[in-house]
Curated annotation (Swiss-Prot):
The keyword Oxidoreductase applies. Optimum pH is 9.0. GO terms for molecular function: 2-oxoglutarate synthase activity. It comes from the Archaea. InterPro entries: 2-oxoacid_oxidoreductase, PFOR_II, Pyrv_Fd/Flavodoxin_OxRdtase_N, THDP-binding, Transketo_C/PFOR_II. This is 2-oxoglutarate synthase subunit KorA. Keywords: Oxidoreductase. Gene3D superfamilies: 3.40.50.920, 3.40.50.970. The lineage of its organism: Archaea, Methanobacteriati, Methanobacteriota, Methanomada group, Methanobacteria. Optimum temperature is 70 degrees Celsius. PANTHER family: SUBUNIT OF PYRUVATE:FLAVODOXIN OXIDOREDUCTASE, SUBUNIT OF PYRUVATE:FLAVODOXIN OXIDOREDUCTASE-RELATED.
């Protein structure tokens, strides 16, 4: 039965995880994400799941990786400092194609920064935080409803592409309370199970979509799981240049070749926009209001709300750059996704930045003033 709730974003992430089939959570308390762990500790036992509070964030993501290879869906939640500690395991999960979800409720940074204040300072860390060439998927909610919906989608994407997926929330979205609708059932995708008997199974042999089938430990299949460069059997093959290139390119291509299926943006008034405002997460709320105000004053403004920062929506941004005279990037940092927009729009449109740090969200009038100054 579909029901309505008045809850905060962090609770919605937890409920989204449960609805998506998550049955294992390991984490370490850190502001402003702790409510996710608290809610999972309450909800999981009733669903036959397991909650573990680990000694630190390193152990938390390691435990999730182990649980996922044990056959369940797993998640952890953290904030910037903890996300930094997880990066070695993020790379390991990418290399071993371990599907899992990380919720990063961003706060002011660097270092321990502003534990109780909002930020969007982990955007580049989500994409490039671990060493090496790899691709991940990241989603950026701007409302409590999206915290639920995007967490469900994060699990589906993780399972479909066997990749770590990051939900890039922030303190504002995580702690705001709104009415949301939670359906009785949601679309649930599961990793592909082996279609051949154990004696014939090749664990890292890709299917047509570049994604291998995935058994669980204990199912009777032999599956070596190593962070070393490995062949399709899973055996280390670290001295083979051709083998390494083949593996790493496949890890990237399984995301990049499905970019059109993964990327999600929302647009408003972009058909005739002379100035297009680009944002993601919490600032998108102010952007929509500011653009509406600008249009009421005769300015042909529009907006693009990026729901999937990674993989970056290059096609959509390029189209905006081709049709608009100027682009404005609004984000709660000193400029991170701004550089991606600038890269894609180079030679087509002028790109400006409206940054903000210190823990507060942009006000609509601040954005409106910037738009009016760009006319």
């Amino acid at each position: 039965m579909t029901e309505e709730y008045f809850i905060q974003g962090n609770d919605a992430c937890a409920r989204g995880a449960i609805s998506a089939g998550c049955r294992f959570f390991a984490g370490y308390p850190i502001t402003p994400s702790t409510e996710i762990a608290e809610e999972m500790a309450v909800l999981l036992p009733g669903e036959g799941g397991v909650f573990v509070q680990m000694e630190d964030e390193i152990g938390a993501l390691g435990a999730v990786i182990g649980a996922v290879w044990g056959g369940v869906k797993g998640m952890t939640a953290t904030s910037g400092p903890g996300f930094s500690l997880m990066q070695e395991h993020v790379g390991y999960a990418a290399m071993t194609e371990t599907p899992l979800v990380i919720v990063d409720v961003q706060r002011g940074s660097p270092s321990t920064g502003q534990p109780t204040m909002a930020s969007q300072s982990d955007m580049m860390q989500a994409r490039w935080g671990s060493h090496g060439d790899y691709e991940i998927i990241a989603l950026s909610p701007s409302s409590v409803q999206e915290c639920f919906d995007f967490t469900v989608r994060a699990f589906n994407l993780a399972e479909e592409y066997r990749v770590p997926v990051v939900v890039l929330s922030d303190e504002i979205v995580g702690h705001m309370r709104e009415k949301i609708t939670i359906p009785d059932k949601v679309e649930i995708r599961k990793r592909k199970s082996p279609t051949s008997p154990p004696g014939e199974f090749i664990p890292f042999k890709p299917q047509g979509d570049f994604v291998p089938e995935m058994p669980a430990f204990g199912d009777g299949y032999r599956v070596p799981v190593t962070g070393l460069t490995h062949d399709e059997r899973g055996y280390p093959d670290a001295s083979n240049p051709e083998g390494h290139e083949k593996l790493v390119k496949r890890l990237c291509d399984k995301i990049l070749n499905h970019r059109d299926k993964i990327v999600d943006v929302q647009k408003g008034w972009t058909d005739d926009a002379d100035i297009t405002v680009i944002s993601y997460g919490a600032p998108s709320r102010s952007v929509a209001t500011a653009v509406k105000m600008a249009r009421s004053e005769g300015v042909r403004a529009g907006y693009i709300k990026i729901n999937t920062p990674w993989p970056f929506p290059e096609t959509e941004i390029r189209e905006a750059a081709e049709s608009s005279r100027k682009l404005l990037v609004v984000e709660m940092n000193l400029g991170q996704m701004f550089y991606e927009v600038q890269r894609v729009a180079s030679g087509m449109a002028e790109v400006e930045l409206l940054p903000k740090i210190g823990g507060e969200i942009h006000r609509p009038d601040e954005i409106l003033n910037k738009i009016m100054g760009m006319k």
